[in-house]
């Protein structure tokens, strides 16, 4: 078993904690990031626990094998999961065939347990004496018994705290987590989440915004691209991200500049800013500092020597 917990002030550094995870984190709110993240890796499952002081969007690809289960507490009920809100006391189940998409409010603590679909089905068969009654594809909201979420969180906490030096104790904690996951699935029923029209509109708009990161876009241009009126589009983005589509694209562009500044592909703040359509460098630098809590020149200076 391996276990690690660390404090972070940079989302890219926190992403690396998750190892081979094919995903990205996007800070939507303004200010210096302060986050704590922990991970425990056993022989049967992985457990992540993350809490940050900023509004963060989490995106991850489907790997075709791993399911993710997340118990929902009060604060997490205010967050968006696959463009839906979920009630406290439910358990989110993401199938291995669908990308991860969550918009997490500031200070909400996320505890996620990841296990292969094969292992989950095998454990359910062993513990319950029957196959899982429903599909594990897509996103589901599991309406488990009221005791399930606190018990699952308690077992996950024990697994995260288990010492790597006591292999037997860690294995017991891991099996206890797996047993609680099976109990949540067995409680059922599972509600499959279809993509509502407003969520589908956001998805289409995001595809357009990601394709235009080299320049700013106007509300008119976005409305024409997605064939929706301005009010509907703004409401959909405000509901999901707390900002409108134009502001959201600007955040995307700032993150793109930040990524460029950390890489060896740009030599100056000016060059990176211009690539992504920021032509007023003074205004850009001020906005960048407000959003990330540091000057763009500090980001540039923090990359490894030789960049």
Which functions belong to the PLM regions below?
Residues 1-30, 78-213, 218-220, 224-230, ...:
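Alpha-helical bundle regulatory/interaction domains
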């Amino acid at each position: 078993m391996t276990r690690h917990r660390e404090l972070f002030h940079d989302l890219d550094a926190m992403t690396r904690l998750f190892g081979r995870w094919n995903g990205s984190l996007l800070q939507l709110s303004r200010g210096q990031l302060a986050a704590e993240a922990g991970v425990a890796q056993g022989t049967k499952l992985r457990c992540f626990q993350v809490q940050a002081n900023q509004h963060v969007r989490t995106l991850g690809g489907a790997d075709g094998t791993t399911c993710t289960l997340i118990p929902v507490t009060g604060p997490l009920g205010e967050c968006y999961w696959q463009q839906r809100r979920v009630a406290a006391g439910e358990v989110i189940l993401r199938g291995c065939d669908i990308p991860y998409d969550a918009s997490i409010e500031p200070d909400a603590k996320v505890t996620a347990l990841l296990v292969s679909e094969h292992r989950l089905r095998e454990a359910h068969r062993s513990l319950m004496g029957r196959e899982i009654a429903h599909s594990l594809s897509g996103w589901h909201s599991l309406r488990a018994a009221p005791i399930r979420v606190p018990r699952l969180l308690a077992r996950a906490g024990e697994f995260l705290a288990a010492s790597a030096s006591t292999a037997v104790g860690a294995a017991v904690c891991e099996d206890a987590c797996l047993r609680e996951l099976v109990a949540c699935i067995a409680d059922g029923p599972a509600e499959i989440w279809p993509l509502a029209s407003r969520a589908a509109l956001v998805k289409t708009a995001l595809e357009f915004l990601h394709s235009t990161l080299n320049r700013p876009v106007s509300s008119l241009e976005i409305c024409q691209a997605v064939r929706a009126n301005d009010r509907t589009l703004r409401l959909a983005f405000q509901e999901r991200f707390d900002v409108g589509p134009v502001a959201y694209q600007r955040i995307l562009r700032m993150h793109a500049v930040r990524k460029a500044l950390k890489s060896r592909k740009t030599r100056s703040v000016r060059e990176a800013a211009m690539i992504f359509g920021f032509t007023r460098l003074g205004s850009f630098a001020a906005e960048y500092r407000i959003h990330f809590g540091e000057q763009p020149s500090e980001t540039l200076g923090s990359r490894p020597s030789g960049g």
